[in-house]
Amino acid sequence: MRTEYCGQLRQSHVGQQVTLCGWVNRRRDLGSLIFIDLRDREGIVQVFFDPDRAEALKLASELRNEFCIQVTGTVRARDEKNINADMATGEIEVLASDLTIINRSESLPLDSNHVNTEEARLKFRYLDLRRPEMAQRLKTRAKITSLVRRFMDDHGFLDIETPMLTKATPEGARDYLVPSRVHKGKFYALPQSPQLFKQLLMMSGFDRYYQIVKCFRDEDLRADRQPEFTQIDVETSFMTAPQVRELMEALVRSLWLDVKGVDLGDFPIMTFAEAERRYGSDKPDLRNPMELVDVADLLKAVEFAVFSGPANDAKGRVAALRVPGGASLSRKQIDDYGNFVKIYGAKGLAYIKVTERAKGIEGITSPVAKFLNAEIVESILERTGAQDGDMIFFGADNKKVVADALGALRLKLGKDLSLTDEAKWAPLWVIDFPMFEDDGEGGLTAMHHPFTSAKDMNADELKAAPETAIANAYDMVINGYEVGGGSVRIHSGEMQQTVFGILGINEQEQREKFGFLLDALKYGTPPHAGLAFGLDRLTMLLTGTDNIRDVIAFPKTTAAACLMTEAPSFANPASLAELGIDVVKKEEKN
């Protein structure tokens, strides 16, 4: 039906007859001439109808926005005064000779001239996706997956599919369950990741596996989370953690170079402990220059319990955050930031305004200054690197609250005060995570997943002191987003059972839930390691949006609903009966 895409026409096509198909993006009727901007997935080109082609001109008078049409015409060079430098096709136009209206369009429920609500965009997603910026994002996503496949193929990886209907296993979030008609009362689970299957593929001898795969997690959603999402899933045998990181870093660097023309350079490596200490986060945004600085040792003897209490507590922390230029913040702004940190468990926000650094305690303004002597103030100013016009905020509480509160404040201030360099790319690896964390009920839970190996510990050592174990795990972080994470896996049956035991999974449960894995570990399992990237997050970064729904063709809302199809929906009673399922309705409270 067509010979060219609209957006691909250039000067080299001048004089050629072309047939184009697409949608009317805009129409301008000048009486004897009608101009339209014709749009397809590749872009927009100007088409005009003149009186010499009377039949086409007459039909063109009926055109309205979003009519689907076919146009045949001749490509012409525009007069120099009419060249549009803002359009890729701005040096040419098409003189139409024939026009076919394939389908007319009703008035649109979306307004192309204004910002539409996200609810409207999701309800009429098929119209929203016609917008050039949305089409470009999905084209970039397709390019990314193509580049990934080429890279993985070039490095000897095999693309192997794993099951979508599998067994429910505890991986940290709730499973989406699928009832079995054949085995009434039993359920499949949609995979949260192909984790165990890719490990089994290594045990099967495939050595290098990858897959671009859908995963499902029934969890509370955030702005950058979806109930179904896509992973670039990778697993290797006989490779160390540094080797896996080197290879996956090369993959990501190649994506940025091909898609953005940016060389990311070598990724720095930072331990979990250092990231938490300096940035209050295990996914630090290194574009932001501010850092948390420990000052507890300076405040142990002050007669101010808010500081001295945590300063003398082994589980406590007192940290300072220097904000360049922050002394200009108003009282209301300071109060707002104080309320902000309360979201993260902090009780408030002490501060020092530095007006004249050279005067020491005489050159500051602070509601806590009366508790501090000149020597302490000077030490704080020196340690934080404070200068005239700076603000120093303090966090004093248990270590987690201080890290969470000041870490979040650091990000907010970086954005509010334009301290974060938005034009910069800041990738890094975070390594050496704790293997376990407190589950809040006196037990331990795996920080990554139960199949991650410990670093430099055997089973007996791990059993004796699990809370000290460091996981052989690694996360890739770019601009404050965790884009990928992985680990060296356990390849010993004894070690795997030890980890299960530490997590409170008894031997009977181990057999019921993971018997197939424990059996497989008996037969010469190779050392193996892997990683999974979030394709949606990578695409989000590479297309410059901060909304993950912008890079998914048909996403769900934060309530896990599809506004377009109205999923989820009630099932047919006959289908439920066939599955042996009764729906228990909640009683409505009066």
Curated annotation (Swiss-Prot):
Region (Aspartate): 195-198
Enzyme Commission number(s): 6.1.1.12
Record's GO cellular component terms: cytoplasm
Stored SUPFAM superfamilies: Class II aaRS and biotin synthetases, GAD domain-like, Nucleic acid-binding proteins
Key words of the record: Aminoacyl-tRNA synthetase, ATP-binding, Cytoplasm, Ligase, Nucleotide-binding, Protein biosynthesis
Oligomeric and partner information: Homodimer.
Physiological role: Catalyzes the attachment of L-aspartate to tRNA(Asp) in a two-step reaction: L-aspartate is first activated by ATP to form Asp-AMP and then transferred to the acceptor end of tRNA(Asp).
Record protein name field: Aspartate--tRNA ligase
Gene giving rise to this polypeptide: aspS
